């Protein structure tokens, strides 16, 4: 079940961290990291008002520093990024998971 979006006013920088719910390895090798970077670039193209200031990818989580221009953009961007990455991750591994990673 999706969580209620947080209010995140535009014009401010936000540190966002996302990890798997069960601590599973999210990024096993270079192609996994590169696949996430492609999804990240695609998401930024979909929400042109969101600026990526910095990012760090770890084996079981990632950190982003994002600067949304408008109110509500951060939630929309993170929802799309999380759901798209999870769907592609499950499809690549032929797992039956639905929703967030680690289910």
Which stretches of residues belong to each language-model region?
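Short catalytic/metal-binding and nucleic-acid-binding patches
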Residues: 1-103
């Amino acid at each position: 079940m999706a969580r209620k979006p947080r209010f995140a006013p535009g014009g401010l920088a936000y540190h966002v961290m996302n990890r798997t719910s069960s601590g599973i390895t999210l990024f096993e090798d270079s192609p996994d990291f590169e696949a996430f970077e492609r999804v990240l670039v695609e998401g930024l193209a979909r929400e042109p008002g969101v600026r990526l200031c910095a990012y760090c990818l770890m084996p079981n989580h990632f950190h982003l520093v994002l600067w949304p221009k408008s109110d509500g953009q951060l939630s929309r961007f993170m929802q799309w990024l999380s759901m798209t990455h999870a769907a592609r991750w499950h499809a690549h591994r032929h797992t039956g998971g639905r929703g967030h990673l680690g289910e």
